[in-house]
């Protein structure tokens, strides 16, 4: 089978070549936490409203080349990168959260992620039911389906890991779609037809509760994938939504099976101080269920950031219904939710200008 892109990798390939891992040096890590603490001292406190912070509040220089290389890997390479050695020892949760935000301010425009229009979310179990019509996996400890998030890239920084489970799983949609085309071309064709996705009650004013898009689309030789079983299943329960055909159902089941084949599904435990960066157009991700610590301060905790990137590629036209536009290098994607207000609009405009991007 001919490889269609660097993102079409197998587990054996990413295990043999660890060029997608980017360790920060001691001085680079020290600069990150020093920048956060200096900003908090000058313009703090550290827990001030997150959208009040500006890129220029965080003086970064040494760490930027390593971080930039990781983002290039996500765009032009294997569609995933792991940055290691973010400062963790002696760093408070709020400092770690702000450090994640500071990195985002230097590399894109953060996007809202949920019905409450949050721009950075704490990934922590609060007892939410993942399979409910409004369930979100990041607030549960359940095993998650493979999926992509609603932005150009997603950043996950690890503050605490679970004592048991919670393993991160990544699988290349480019690889899986190549396999499906070779093994079942009828399923591959079905994956390029429209499926319906529920917005899980997070739609903003003027948006429908569901939208339609193909699971797989090829544009300029690249595979773009939207796959989220939970949202497809929830959409089927909404009145007036077109029902999937038998072939469409079989196709996504087969596609998901291919994603989970041992040769395609790469597993890693995110450790405290790790920053995982994934391309949401090509790289599907998931997580195993986990058992947590009893003490709240030890519980599995990550911080999730969705970014629109200044060097983003043009999207397939069918993606514009969710992203707002398919135009490259624009502030696009995210879920505006129910609390998208002037504060958020002003942040988007200010950060877009700082990054030289066109605001939506």
Regions found by a protein language model. Name each.
Residues 100-110:
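A short alpha->loop->secondary-structure connector
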């Amino acid at each position: 089978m001919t490889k269609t892109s660097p993102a079409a990798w197998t587990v054996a390939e990413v295990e043999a070549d660890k060029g997608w891992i980017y360790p920060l040096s001691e001085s680079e890590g020290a600069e990150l936490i020093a920048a956060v603490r200096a900003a908090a001292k000058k313009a703090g406190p550290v827990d001030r409203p997150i959208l009040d912070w500006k890129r220029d509040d965080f003086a970064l220089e040494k760490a930027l080349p390593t971080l930039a290389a990781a983002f290039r890997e996500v765009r032009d390479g294997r569609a995933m990168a792991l940055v290691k050695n973010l400062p963790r020892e002696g760093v408070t949760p709020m400092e770690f959260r702000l450090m994640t935000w500071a990195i985002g301010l230097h590399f894109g425009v953060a996007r809202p992620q949920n019905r409450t229009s949050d721009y950075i979310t704490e990934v922590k179990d609060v007892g939410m039911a993942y399979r409910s019509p409004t369930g979100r996996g990041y607030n549960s400890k359940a095993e998650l389906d493979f999926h992509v998030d609603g932005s150009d890239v997603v950043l996950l920084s690890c503050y605490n890991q679970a004592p048991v489970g919670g393993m991160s799983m990544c699988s290349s949609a480019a690889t899986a779609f190549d396999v499906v085309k070779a093994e079942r071309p009828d399923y591959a064709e079905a994956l390029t037809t429209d499926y319906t996705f529920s917005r899980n009650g997070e739609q903003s004013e003027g948006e429908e509760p569901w939208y339609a898009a193909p699971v797989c689309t090829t544009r300029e030789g690249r595979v773009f994938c939207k796959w989220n079983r939970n949202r497809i299943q929830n959409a089927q329960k909404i009145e007036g939504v077109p029902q999937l055909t038998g072939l469409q159902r079989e196709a996504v089941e087969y596609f998901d099976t291919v994603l989970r084949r041992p040769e395609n599904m790469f597993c890693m435990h995110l450790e405290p101080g790790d920053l995982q960066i994934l391309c949401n157009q090509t790289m599907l991700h998931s997580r195993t269920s986990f058992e947590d610590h009893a003490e709240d301060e030890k519980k599995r905790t990550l911080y999730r950031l969705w970014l629109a990137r200044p060097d983003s590629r043009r999207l397939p036209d069918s993606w514009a219904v969710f992203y707002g536009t398919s135009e490259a290098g624009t502030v696009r994607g995210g879920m505006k939710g129910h609390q998208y207000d002037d504060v958020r609009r002003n942040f988007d405009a200010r950060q877009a200008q700082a990054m030289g991007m066109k605001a939506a």
